[in-house]
Regions:
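Conserved AMP-binding A3 loop
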Residues: 1-10
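Short, well-ordered alpha-helical scaffold segments within catalytic/effector domains
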Residues: 9-13, 41, 67, 89-90
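Glycine-rich helix-loop-beta junction characteristic of Rossmann-like nucleotide cofactor-binding loops
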Residues: 18-22
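Conserved adenylate-forming
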Residues: 24-25, 50-53, 58-121
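RNase H-like, metal-dependent nuclease domains and their acidic two-metal-ion catalytic environment used
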Residues: 36
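Conserved short alpha-helical elements in the N-terminal third of ANL/AMP-binding
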Residues: 39-55
Length: 121
């Protein structure tokens, strides 16, 4: 795969503000695999280019060890915006259908949750 560096970097910087709604200094988390293009683009390059702290997470965010992993990471690292696949949201809903686990964490700083990569329905 060949990436034209300048255009790719300009697009990543633009999407950090205009898609993920983060300002320099905000904490951003892309719960993706760094081996995928979206992973290294939004775990590494985009946030660092835009002046954001990025959360690097190892493991599955749902089911390991429990459905609260997503929300604990968001609370612990004061995540402002995060991005994941619809599959992760669905797994969270199956594991915690009433949102009881999610409510145990302070996610008041989380302003945006985005999803892409598979159909949401």
């Amino acid at each position: 795969m060949v990436r034209h560096t300048a255009g790719h970097l300009v697009a990543l910087n633009w999407t950090m503000k205009n898609v993920f709604n983060v300002d320099p200094g905000d904490v951003f988390w892309a719960a993706s695999d760094v081996g995928w293009v979206v992973g290294h683009s939004y775990i590494c390059y985009g946030p660092l280019l835009h002046g954001n702290t990025t959360v690097v997470f190892e493991g599955k965010p749902i089911g390991t060890p429990d459905a609260g992993t997503f929300w604990r990471v968001i609370e612990e690292h004061k995540v402002h915006s995060f991005f994941t696949a619809p599959t992760a949201f669905r797994a969270g809903q199956r594991a915690d259908p009433k949102g009881e686990v999610a409510e145990k964490n302070d996610t008041s700083l989380l302003e945006q949750a985005s999803q892409a990569g598979a159909r949401a329905g």
